[in-house]
Amino acid sequence: GEQYVLNLIDTPGHVDFGYEVTRSLAACEGALLLVDASQGVEAQTRKLFAVCRLRRIPVLTFVNKMDLPGRPPLDLMTEVEQALTIHASAVNWPIGSGSDFAGIVTRDVNRVALFSKTAHGGATKVDVQTMALADLAASGRVSADVMGQVQHDLELLAIAGNPLSHKQFL
């Protein structure tokens, strides 16, 4: 397939660096917005998103720290939509959260990427183990409760979620 080069500018989220971050966005064609699973959308996130919107910079939002105690993914998605006044489309969906976090589902192809826990906490993408979503339950890698929640969330997103629109994104 096609290969792409992504040049990332890692900017601080602290309010004291607002000017520098705003200036950095002038060099960007897109932005990756990180939302902490336990904190949700913070004030500085709203400000930076407003600058991206003003400059018509496409934004991908990523919820990180899913392997730590945090809020349910559907609640976070709702908060992102309301706080940023957007129609979010979930491209990936977490499999579990907190201590039950096991990986992600790529929704359009129903493929799973499983993660392994590290000895000091957190998760790492060691030898990427992928499989079809349909094979996840039989793999024994997630509990029946986690599998049921993932299936419930994915069904809800299929019925009531926003489809991904490249035109709207760009």
Regions found by a protein language model. Name each.
Residues 1-30, 37, 44, 49-58:
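Switch I (G2) and immediately adjacent beta-strands of P-loop GTPase domains
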Residues 7-8, 31, 63, 91:
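A near-ubiquitous, low-amplitude feature marking generic local secondary-structure context
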Residues 37-170:
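P-loop NTPase catalytic nucleotide-binding module
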